[in-house]
Amino acid sequence: MASRNFQTLIHPSAVISPSAQIGSGTVVMANAVINADAVVGKGCIINTCASVDHDCVIGDYVHISVGAHIAGTVDIGNKTWIGIGATVSNNVSICGGCIIGAGAVVIRDVNESGTYVGVPIRKIK
Protein backbone atom coordinates (compact mmCIF):
# COMPACT_ATOMS: atom_id res chain seq x y z
CA MET A 1 0.00 0.00 0.00
CA ALA A 2 1.33 3.43 -0.91
CA SER A 3 2.32 5.79 1.87
CA ARG A 4 0.22 8.94 2.22
CA ASN A 5 1.46 12.28 3.44
CA PHE A 6 -1.42 14.23 4.99
CA GLN A 7 -1.39 17.98 5.63
CA THR A 8 -0.55 19.26 9.09
CA LEU A 9 -2.98 22.00 10.13
CA ILE A 10 -2.02 24.61 12.71
CA HIS A 11 -4.41 27.34 13.85
CA PRO A 12 -2.86 30.83 13.65
CA SER A 13 -3.33 31.39 17.40
CA ALA A 14 -1.51 28.18 18.37
CA VAL A 15 1.93 28.66 19.92
CA ILE A 16 4.53 26.13 18.79
CA SER A 17 8.21 26.18 19.71
CA PRO A 18 10.58 26.23 16.74
CA SER A 19 12.29 23.15 18.23
CA ALA A 20 9.05 21.11 18.42
CA GLN A 21 8.37 18.44 15.79
CA ILE A 22 4.84 17.89 14.47
CA GLY A 23 3.92 14.77 12.44
CA SER A 24 1.97 14.74 9.19
CA GLY A 25 -1.80 14.87 9.42
CA THR A 26 -1.73 16.38 12.91
CA VAL A 27 -4.16 19.19 13.74
CA VAL A 28 -3.25 21.86 16.32
CA MET A 29 -6.30 23.90 17.33
CA ALA A 30 -6.77 27.48 18.56
CA ASN A 31 -4.67 28.61 21.52
CA ALA A 32 -2.95 25.24 21.90
CA VAL A 33 0.68 25.36 23.07
CA ILE A 34 3.47 22.95 22.13
CA ASN A 35 6.71 23.77 23.90
CA ALA A 36 10.43 23.22 23.30
CA ASP A 37 11.69 19.89 21.99
CA ALA A 38 8.27 18.23 22.12
CA VAL A 39 7.63 15.57 19.48
CA VAL A 40 4.04 15.02 18.32
CA GLY A 41 3.35 12.01 16.09
CA LYS A 42 1.26 11.73 12.96
CA GLY A 43 -2.51 12.02 12.85
CA CYS A 44 -2.83 13.64 16.29
CA ILE A 45 -5.27 16.26 17.53
CA ILE A 46 -3.98 18.86 19.97
CA ASN A 47 -7.29 20.49 20.77
CA THR A 48 -8.28 24.02 21.78
CA CYS A 49 -6.29 25.45 24.72
CA ALA A 50 -4.42 22.17 25.31
CA SER A 51 -0.75 22.33 26.27
CA VAL A 52 2.12 19.95 25.61
CA ASP A 53 5.17 20.99 27.57
CA HIS A 54 8.89 20.59 26.90
CA ASP A 55 10.49 17.29 25.87
CA CYS A 56 7.23 15.35 25.59
CA VAL A 57 6.88 12.49 23.12
CA ILE A 58 3.31 12.09 21.87
CA GLY A 59 2.71 8.95 19.79
CA ASP A 60 0.69 8.60 16.59
CA TYR A 61 -3.09 9.10 16.54
CA VAL A 62 -3.28 10.63 20.02
CA HIS A 63 -6.09 13.05 20.90
CA ILE A 64 -5.32 15.61 23.58
CA SER A 65 -8.72 17.14 24.34
CA VAL A 66 -9.75 20.71 25.04
CA GLY A 67 -7.90 22.24 27.99
CA ALA A 68 -5.83 19.15 28.80
CA HIS A 69 -2.35 19.87 30.15
CA ILE A 70 0.63 17.60 29.57
CA ALA A 71 3.60 18.55 31.78
CA GLY A 72 7.24 18.22 30.72
CA THR A 73 9.01 15.00 29.76
CA VAL A 74 5.81 12.95 29.34
CA ASP A 75 5.62 9.99 26.94
CA ILE A 76 2.17 9.10 25.56
CA GLY A 77 1.79 5.93 23.46
CA ASN A 78 -0.07 5.54 20.17
CA LYS A 79 -3.87 5.73 19.94
CA THR A 80 -4.37 7.22 23.39
CA TRP A 81 -7.11 9.72 24.22
CA ILE A 82 -6.60 12.33 26.94
CA GLY A 83 -9.97 13.72 28.09
CA ILE A 84 -11.09 17.32 28.42
CA GLY A 85 -9.35 19.15 31.25
CA ALA A 86 -7.13 16.20 32.21
CA THR A 87 -3.70 16.84 33.71
CA VAL A 88 -0.63 14.64 33.23
CA SER A 89 2.19 15.32 35.70
CA ASN A 90 5.81 15.56 34.57
CA ASN A 91 8.05 12.53 33.91
CA VAL A 92 5.08 10.16 33.41
CA SER A 93 4.60 7.52 30.69
CA ILE A 94 1.20 6.42 29.40
CA CYS A 95 1.16 3.29 27.24
CA GLY A 96 -0.73 3.11 23.96
CA GLY A 97 -4.42 2.37 23.70
CA CYS A 98 -5.50 4.24 26.84
CA ILE A 99 -8.42 6.50 27.59
CA ILE A 100 -7.80 9.08 30.30
CA GLY A 101 -11.14 10.50 31.45
CA ALA A 102 -12.26 14.11 31.64
CA GLY A 103 -10.65 16.01 34.51
CA ALA A 104 -8.44 13.07 35.48
CA VAL A 105 -5.02 13.61 37.05
CA VAL A 106 -2.19 11.26 36.06
CA ILE A 107 0.66 11.27 38.60
CA ARG A 108 2.19 7.85 37.92
CA ASP A 109 3.04 5.70 34.90
CA VAL A 110 0.21 3.87 33.13
CA ASN A 111 1.60 0.54 31.90
CA GLU A 112 -1.60 -1.28 30.93
CA SER A 113 -4.09 -0.22 28.25
CA GLY A 114 -7.53 0.64 29.55
CA THR A 115 -9.82 3.39 30.74
CA TYR A 116 -8.66 5.52 33.66
CA VAL A 117 -10.60 8.18 35.58
CA GLY A 118 -10.39 10.20 38.78
CA VAL A 119 -7.99 12.21 40.91
CA PRO A 120 -5.59 10.50 40.99
CA ILE A 121 -6.50 8.07 38.23
CA ARG A 122 -7.76 4.56 38.78
CA LYS A 123 -8.49 1.92 36.15
CA ILE A 124 -12.18 1.21 35.56
CA LYS A 125 -12.05 -0.87 32.39
Residue ranges and their predicted role:
Residues 1-4:
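Short helix-capping segments at alpha-helix termini
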Residues 9-124:
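Structural signal for interior beta-strand "rungs" in well-ordered beta-sheet cores
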